[in-house]
Amino acid sequence: MQVKIEEISSVKRRISVEVPAERVNTEIEKSFAGIQKKATLAGFRKGKAPLQMVKKFYRNAMQDEVMRRLYEQTLFPALDEHKLEPVDAPMIDDIALVEEGTPFKYSALIEIMPQILLGEYKGLQVKKERYVADEKAVEGEIERMRENMAQLAPVEEGTVEKGMVLTVDFSFAVPGYPEEETSGKDASVEVGNGRLLPGLEEGLIGMALGETKDITVTMPDDNPNKELAGKPGVFTVTLKEIKKKELPELNDEFAQQFGDFETIADMRTKLTEMREQQELERIKTDLKTRIIDALIEKNPLEVPDSMVRRQTDFMLENLKNRLKGQNMSLEMMGLDEDGYRQRFWGEAAQKVKGGLLVMALVEQENIAVEEADLEARYAQIAAGNEDMLSRIKEFYAAQANARNSMVAEIKEDKAIAFLLENAVVTEVEAAELNAPVAGE
């Protein structure tokens, strides 16, 4: 058997295999013999048809069987011989039909892990966002809580203003695009929340009860149907009801409705603490992304498309699950699955590269996970609940895969900590995050 390996890229190989004619002949005869035992041809009992007739009528079946058998018998031994480990199923690139007396030739494309030789990974320069307390953000959160507790009171006289909630019947059309026509009855619309198409909100303001009005809007540039971007659309709206939001008074009684607060001052204090915790966690996550990006920049590598594809699938499933929990879908975001994969391919590739480089760093620096590390992680998950801690330990003791995943996570965390301990971290305001670091 002859085997030729061609390097297509650092992570892709073409393997060409030629199986000698003698072996092909043997497999063909073996295949026909097996087919003959099961063959049913007119005028003959099962398994009693002459071999020559079997060869005539079952040639395609023989070719399928022998090609598959020779492929399976030769490809993986050839890969083992050349120490090639595919990261995904090999893909047939070229294959010839099997013929008596002729060598069987085929080629397959495989993807392999990149060879990683870490270069510069100490002294990486990264920026870290400086945490800044923001009283306005806390007050904004309190206002949103008031909005959620607002009562709607009917408005009998007057016209539509910002902040009002309307009940309308409507129809919508884009001239020249009949498939876009739609309509609805008793639709609830809030004016002033920034969610309406450009022009619609302005057209609703000033309408009176019972009024019917044509409102021209401009279709947004990011419309899922690209043909409609920038085109005019017309809403015909009949205003059936106007309601005005009545916000609750901002006092201790309001704060107590949320259960966690005793007074309005207590609410502000605890919301400030919660926001600080959330912001510090966000900054930590952003810093992790930045240090990995810096590592990739200093250690560029190519990664297999199949690994990136799996990462995009993983990200897509996570997004779909999150949206499902919010009663939303990809379509409601103007995306489909293929569009998502295309849009986030670069992000997925970056995640794969970062993961491989971090794994290489773990090996190079002999980063290990001790039992104390696992105990600390168990305690973190249990959050002070002793009964929960006991159950967590029992679970991870019994579930090897879950325990291995936790070990991998801890190794990654320790590798990131190592990178940051050995990095030049510059703390800056949020507005300066994407400006070049001095010396770059």
From Swiss-Prot:
InterPro entries with a match to the protein in the record: PPIase_dom_sf, PPIase_FKBP_dom, Trig_fac, Trigger_fac_C, Trigger_fac_C_sf, Trigger_fac_ribosome-bd_bac, Trigger_fac_ribosome-bd_sf, Trigger_fact/SurA_dom_sf
GO cellular component entries: cytoplasm
Keyword Cell division applies: yes
The UniProt record lists the keyword Cell cycle: yes
One Pfam family hit: Trigger_C
PROSITE patterns: FKBP_PPIASE (PS50059)
Top-level EC class as recorded in UniProt: isomerase
Superkingdom of origin: Bacteria
EC identifiers of the protein: 5.2.1.8
GO biological process, one term: protein unfolding
UniProt domain comment: Consists of 3 domains; the N-terminus binds the ribosome, the middle domain has PPIase activity, while the C-terminus has intrinsic chaperone activity on its own.
Entries under PANTHER family matching the protein: TRIGGER FACTOR CHAPERONE AND PEPTIDYL-PROLYL CIS/TRANS ISOMERASE, TRIGGER FACTOR-LIKE PROTEIN TIG, CHLOROPLASTIC
Function: Involved in protein export. Acts as a chaperone by maintaining the newly synthesized protein in an open conformation. Functions as a peptidyl-prolyl cis-trans isomerase.
NCBIfam families (alphabetical): tig
HAMAP family, alphabetized: Trigger_factor_Tig
Family: Belongs to the FKBP-type PPIase family. Tig subfamily.
Protein's name according to its UniProt entry: Trigger factor
